Amino acid sequence: MEVRVSKAVRFSRYGGSEVLEVVEVDDRPPAQGEVRVRVVAAGINPGEIAIREGAMESVTPSRFSRGEGPEGEGSDFAGVIVEVGDRVDGVSVGDEVIGFSDWRSAQAESVTLPADHVIPKPHGVSWDVAGSLFVAGTTARACVDAVRIRRGDTVVVAGAAGGVGILATQLAVLGGAAVVATASKENHAFLESIGAIPVEYGKGLVDRIRRIVPDGVDAFIDTHGDGNVEAAVKLGVDRDRINTIIDWPARKKFGVRGEGMSTVAPRETLIELARLLANGELVLPIQATYPLDQVRAAYERQGKRHGLGKIVLEVTPAP
């Protein structure tokens, strides 16, 4: 039997973007209950930088640290099913899908995974948006759920111009909250367009928020770090309604929440998000796109933590 090969991102040691390589790997045929997908687009996420630099080894150890070979990269993708394993119902070769990989292997021309890790891609959702939806979307949903947003609440979303922040802001607005969104000035017009009240981050943030919402803040979502948890505490937010996805020292110091994507049902949440995007109730801007062989440049841009929306790898041609 002929073995097919395709390109994939791999790294064999911890470090900066220089450790990332695009290499040829054997395509694994789908086993029972699995599908193989040709990846069209794959998202880039900040947390992947922390994993690749070794900062998360105690939580998500790499394959190479266990002596199991190189590590893959990425969880988000969208593509076209090219093979279907035995005992798989509801999907067929040629179906356009949005998916998620449990094994950080999505940044590749081909990915094989359980069939329940893909959902239909709505026709109205672009490949770039579909390919960068899973991590940001499920994390945003988890953040909003963690702080128990109720209709009429005032909520601050810190770091609102990133993928998680943009989606958390919109989910909170859809839930009936008034959202104060922190971001640099160049992103304020966009945040206003999605229903938020923008405020510039940095020194004096607490005073600026108090002037905007003198009656106080009910909940606070931190997607950026850099003192936002302390700001939430100074604003008098109930610590059980403060959630950070990045500032673990502050989480421990102040006793706030630290809930992320692992706390929501992945497939069901992805279906909900795709429906909201297709209906026009959510938008997800794309900051930049790169071909697979420029993955290092893509992560270098991500590491600057500036810009509006998602960075995406365009892996193979769209149908």
Where are the regions a protein language model picked out?
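A structural motif shared across PLP-dependent enzymes of the aminotransferase-like
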Residues: S101-A115
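Short helix-loop-beta connector
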Residues: S92, H123-S126, R148-T154
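A glycine-/small-residue-rich N-terminal strand-loop-strand element
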Residues: F77-D102
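Mid-domain Rossmann-like dinucleotide-binding core that forms the NAD(H)/NADP(H) cofactor-binding site
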Residues: G131-G202
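N-terminal glycine-rich beta->alpha transition that marks the start or flank
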Residues: E2-R4, G16-V19, V25-A78
